[in-house]
């Protein structure tokens, strides 16, 4: 970039930050009611711009509005954002009226002595009906209990943030991510935000400036577009007090420790980061799906195979929550049957446009040494069975961020012994700490509750799911979302800190989501769902005006899936 362009970028940035500095002072003076009114004003804008939002994302990803995949852009875009805004508004109302967030149930102590805080269902949003059969809890750190649940809460005094400006470097894959990250910084952390959109989804600029006009008008938010030069200017600007980054750990390390290997090594050795301001992040993950050996019915096997396949193909697999490593037992009699079901499902799902930059190169890297026939510009869904961490280390230690999933086997027919070995394996051999799933037979869940809870406790992940895809945890918005709290600047793994967390919990380690082996009605994220787009739009209408009168149409479409 030439000097003139650099100067122009700096002038624009300085002008933008000047507006935010005034907004930061105004935010400090805003009452709870005033902030809630801003939240509600943004929520009121979403229905007017939702169609535009979905159309531009589908167009960019080459998805027809009539395809099942179009539902992903509704659910992971305006519908999810509207749910989050409703939950945020409810949080501020609860704090204003009751002094604390109102949990959906009472905390409990589980069999291994961990305090578990319920965060689902939210009855005001009809969760018991919409997320039927699912439960979610936040597990506190072992040394904490229910007597110290909440972080510093929003208040009329508004001591949070203290006039600070946050730089948010947005995700390029899922449209709700930059929006919810930005909202978290403003309404949880009390910091105004300079949001830089990722070049991959800069097409959201017009939609976002319209939806979030109430925040922009109050100078609590400014949105910029641009490439690396704009990102670097934001990171290094002295008036930016904190950063939130969504991307790969390579991006994080380049920001914190430097752009080349020697510089990074020297700075790490001397504990001398390039950036001396707080940094939170959500990074990548080689997401594991552990299958506990046991006897499953054909229906259960098929349902779990669909869950796995859905987790691979969602958003063309450009997700940090996409399953990248299935862990099975070499002694499990149903292993071949299960994997064949996953393979068949993947073969029957049309390949998707690989819209994310570098996908072809990452696909070839993941399939190194294998002959893969590619007959179209789209990349084929690929399941690589019986992989080994020594001969194919890249599949275990690098998030491919492309439509490739691997499978590896561990010995053992005893379910408890296998699960213990699998937990140790994914903790030690796989990159990342974001999320993991365990599929377990009903008999195991019923008879080995203690073993299952110990396994969940030992997994070093920010979210652990039983029989369900971790993408659901992201979409719920009530759970804290982020990597395991053991991460730090030198080893960020899947990220530092968290977002969402609409009950303002603290001292937590992970979210635990549980569901049945067979979900009814069919999950809307299954590719085989026949009416997914109708469900998505009906859900958005429900979150627009939560009312029992909007449920019949939602259920009509859901039951036809």
Give residue spans per PLM region:
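N-terminal Rossmann-like NAD(P)+-binding subdomain of aldehyde/semialdehyde dehydrogenases
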Residues: 1-150, 184-185, 197-202, 211-216, ...
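Conserved C-terminal structural/oligomerization subdomain of aldehyde/semialdehyde dehydrogenase
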Residues: 2-11, 15-41, 159-160, 167, ...
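ALDH superfamily catalytic-core signature
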Residues: 48, 192, 199, 209-220, ...
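Active-site-adjacent "gating/activation" loops or surface patches in catalytic cores
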Residues: 133-176, 180
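PLP-dependent aminotransferase-like
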Residues: 165, 177-229
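Short catalytic-loop micro-motif centered on adjacent basic/acidic residues
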Residues: 168, 194-196, 221-222, 242-244, ...
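An acidic- and aromatic-residue-enriched active-site/binding cleft used to recognize and process polar
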Residues: 171-172, 198-201, 226-229, 245-249, ...
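Hydrophobic/aromatic ligand-binding patch that stacks against planar heteroaromatic rings
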Residues: 184-185, 233-234, 425
């Amino acid at each position: 970039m030439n000097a003139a362009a650099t100067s122009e970028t700096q002038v624009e940035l300085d002008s933008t930050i000047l507006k935010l500095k005034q907004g930061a002072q105004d935010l400090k003076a805003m009452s709870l009611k005033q902030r809630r009114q801003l939240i509600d004003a943004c929520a009121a804008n979403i229905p007017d711009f939702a169609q535009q939002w979905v159309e531009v994302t589908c167009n960019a990803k080459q998805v027809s509005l009539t395809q099942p995949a179009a539902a992903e852009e509704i659910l992971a875009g305006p519908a999810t954002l509207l749910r989050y805004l409703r939950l945020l508004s409810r949080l501020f109302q609860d704090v204003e009226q009751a002094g604390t967030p109102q949990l959906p149930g009472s905390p409990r102590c589980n069999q291994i002595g961990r305090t578990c805080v319920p965060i689902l269902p939210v009855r005001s949003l009809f969760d018991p009906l919409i997320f039927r059969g699912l439960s979610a809890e936040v597990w506190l750190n072992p040394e904490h209990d229910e007597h110290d649940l909440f972080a510093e809460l929003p208040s009329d005094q508004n001591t949070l943030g203290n006039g600070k400006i946050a730089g948010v470097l947005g995700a390029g894959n899922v449209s709700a991510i930059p929006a919810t990250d930005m909202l978290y910084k403003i309404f949880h952390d009390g910091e105004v935000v300079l949001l830089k959109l990722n070049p991959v989804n800069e097409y959201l600029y017009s939609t976002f400036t319209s939806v979030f006009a109430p925040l922009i008008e109050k100078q609590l938010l400014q949105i910029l577009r641009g490439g690396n030069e704009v990102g670097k200017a934001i990171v290094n600007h002295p008036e930016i007090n904190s950063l939130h980054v969504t991307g790969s750990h390579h991006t994080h390390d380049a920001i914190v420790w430097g752009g080349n290997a020697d510089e990074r090594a020297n700075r790490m050795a001397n504990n001398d980061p390039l950036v001396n301001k707080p940094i939170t992040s959500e990074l990548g993950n080689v997401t594991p799906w552990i299958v506990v050996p046991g006897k499953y019915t054909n229906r259960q096997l098929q349902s779990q195979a669909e869950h796995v396949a859905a987790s691979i193909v969602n958003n063309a697999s450009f997700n940090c929550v996409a399953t990248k490593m299935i862990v099975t037992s070499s002694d499990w009699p149903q292993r071949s049957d299960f994997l064949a079901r996953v393979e068949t499902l993947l073969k029957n799902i049309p390949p998707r446009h690989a819209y994310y930059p570098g996908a072809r190169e990452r696909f070839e890297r993941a399939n190194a040494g294998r002959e893969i026939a590619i007959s179209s510009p789209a990349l084929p869904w690929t399941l690589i069975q019986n992989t080994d961490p020594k001969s194919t280390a890249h599949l275990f230690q690098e998030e491919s961020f492309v439509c490739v999933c691997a499978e590896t086997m561990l010995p053992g027919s005893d379910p408890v012994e296998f699960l213990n070995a699998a937990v140790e394996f994914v903790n030690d051999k796989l990159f990342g700490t974001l999320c993991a799933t365990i599929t377990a037979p009903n008999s195991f869940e019923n008879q080995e509750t203690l073993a299952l809870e110990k396994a969940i406790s030992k997994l070093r992940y920010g979210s652990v799911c039983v029989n369900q895809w971790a993408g659901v945890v992201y979409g719920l918005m009530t759970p804290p979302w982020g990597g395991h709290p053991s991460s730090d600047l030198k080893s960020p793994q899947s990220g530092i800190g968290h977002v969402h967390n609409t009950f303002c919990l603290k001292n937590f380690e992970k979210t635990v989501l549980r569901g049945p082996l067979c979900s009814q009605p069919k999950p809307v994220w299954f590719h085989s769902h026949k009416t997914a787009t109708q469900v998505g739009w009906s859900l958005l209408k429900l979150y627009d005006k939560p009312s029992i009168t909007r449920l019949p149409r939602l259920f009509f479409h859901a039951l036809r899936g």
